[in-house]
Amino acid sequence: MSETKKLQGKVAVITGGTSGIGLAAAKLFVKEGAYVFITGRRQKELDEAVKAIGSNVTGVQGDIANLTDLDRLYKAVATKGRIDVVFANAGVAEFAALGKITEEHFDKLFEINVKGTLFTVQKALPLLKDGGSIILNGSVASVKGAAAFGVYGATKAALRSFVRTWTSDLKDRHIRSNVISPGPTDTPVIDGQPADAIARIVSTIPMGRMGEPDEIAKVALFLASDDSSFVTGIELFVDGGRGQV
């Protein structure tokens, strides 16, 4: 007797689905029976991701900070008639120490990580099925201070605040809202870092290594599926213990 797939017949939206955690989640969701819409800012990378996922996927080019792009995304999603899962994964990380923070740096991070995430979810609501799942991609930086990461950490702390509020806002629709907060993860964001910087990062993680995108994707699958039917309003750390010590 074959095992039932955890997302059989469900429709999921994953922003930032062309690489790293978003791509890993899209592959896993499709494997578990979902039809997935992914977004990315660059068409070439989007096309490559769609090819890598292979089936039951539509790619929609766009920037989550651009509300017109979000409208275009949900116009495409509307062809499926509903959404069961929103994984607001897209975001940006940049360093700037206090004293060197520019208005441009501040505005860019809040525009994408906070405004973009908020409107990704809000514009999904008309299509989001009662009993559906909202998942935000946060960061251990929401609770763990890191040099020159003050603005980024503040944007991720805002996501924690969002899910607390949305749990109440959406309770009558039984829509669950949770945030995954990864620690340092081996994604393209890390690729450009010097070896000594990566070594310093790893030294702060009790498990002695960075996370893998697939490990974060498995947690997203848990929160997307009925396995987490009584889980809402939480920040779930997937950080190798970094934020806990």
Feature annotation, model-predicted:
Residues 179, 200-227, 231, 238-240:
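C-terminal helical subdomain
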Residues 11, 18-19:
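Conserved glycine-rich cofactor-binding loop
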Residues 121, 155, 163:
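Active-site helix of classical SDR
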Residues 2-3, 8, 144, 221, ...:
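Short C-terminal tail/terminal secondary-structure segment
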